[in-house]
Amino acid sequence: MDSEIAGRFREQDTSILPSSLAWVNVARIKLLAAVVFYVFALVYGHDKYLSLVQAFWGFNSPHFNLSNMLLIIVLAVIPAFVMPLYLTRPSSLFIYALVFCVYLPGVVTGMLNYEDSIDRYLGLFSCFCIGLVGCCLAVRCVPLRSNASRSFSRPLLLTCVLGSLTCFLVLFLTYKDILSFSGVDDIYAQREKGAATSLFIGYCQVYLAYFFSPVLFATGLISKRILIALLGFAGFIFVFMITAERTVLLLPFAMFLMAFIFKARGANPNAPVYLFVGGGVMVFLIAELFDQVGLFQELGFYFYTRLIACPGLFVTQYYDLFSTQGFTYWAHVSGISWFAEVPAAYAADEKWPALGKILAERVLGVQSQSNASFVATDGVAAAGGPGVLAIFMLYTVWLIALDWVSQGWNKVLLLTALFPLAFISTNGPFSTMLASFGGGLWIAMLWFDKFRMKLWGHRL
């Protein structure tokens, strides 16, 4: 049975663009149908919810015509022909997060927001589509192993435990006077109190919440080691008591759900279908019931608007701002900023290089942080469509490296632990994801734990 499943994996991974209808198997047809269903749900939600309730953020009344609807469908289904069918490698997790939260919502919102949307954004979304398709094809170069059962070594887990406890101690000594479970009314006051007082404190916050705690919680959950799982869970709660980030509080519950899905459906080609169908059904329910049921009103803001709609909207908002006031040409990226000149339009702006704050002030007229995906910040804002292609090249190289060092690991464990990072990839710059949220450390850690010499029976 295992060899049969492995054969299906290899067969699916080596398939390229279809040369005949025989290539389009049942699973691929289901995925295409699910993507189209999700797209129509987003169109319906834009018309019945976003443009009515969330217009402040930039969701305009939709402009329906045959040409933009056809273009939406074409841009949606092209990547679906090459997207992975199985959630069996880290790159699949990141690709689906990007498509679900950024690409498809961006295409729908961008094409509906203006009467001249096609003239405005056709080149931009064509580059986005090309970059995504190229990424889906390129990650297939890493072979998939069927004997993926390795768990994190004891020295690695000990390192994560020590790292977690160190962050606990440093953060407790820094914030012991303001620790609290903030309610809805005082959540922003708590965030102000819990703001990082230095670069080191900031790294302690994000690494505890997005690296050490996910590793420990996933390990404890999958291997049924209760104390390890509790330590990871405590890390999420502790950071929430400092920063009042709802995302951090919800991560362990989302990871628990993801672990169940990866274990039950990871080798099932219908798993991505459930993602798009489930997301589409949720959007339909929100659009129909947000003004009748309080639960759907909350889901409308936190699930639909914040998680799905805004990351997609930011692709076009960043393009509208930076294409007119000047692209950054990656001068906002740490390291490049040391020798690159700040564009004239932002040289006197005290918010530079925080592009999200610049956009919030200049487009929305508010003091906020419009966090966007790496496509918007490191691609669109940097150089428009060509910038998107450039950042996709780097992103694809990183995904290939991550898949390569992930060979042989327990896939359920690894995908569960990586889920928070996949979420961050839809809401943050690529450089921030690598340095501040552990994207680079993951590759180093897996390589170190996998290829170093053995001591005392464990890999070091």
Roles of regions detected by a PLM:
Residues 18-21, 45-60, 186-199, 203, ...:
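Small-residue-enriched transmembrane helix-hairpin modules in multi-pass membrane proteins
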Residues 29-31, 247, 307:
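Hydrophobic alpha-helical segments, especially transmembrane helices
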Residues 8-17, 124-133, 222-302, 398:
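Hydrophobic alpha-helical segments of polytopic membrane proteins
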Residues 76-81, 106-128, 234-260, 357-365:
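Hydrophobic alpha-helical transmembrane segments of integral membrane proteins
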Residues 1-212, 216-217, 263-270, 284, ...:
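Membrane-anchoring hydrophobic segments
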Residues 238-249, 255-256, 376-404:
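Active-site beta-strand/loop microenvironment that shapes enzyme catalytic pockets
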Residues 95-97, 107-111, 223-244, 342-352:
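Cytoplasmic juxtamembrane regions at transmembrane-helix boundaries
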Residues 229-233, 369-371, 414:
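Short hydrophobic/aromatic segments of transmembrane alpha-helices and their interfaces
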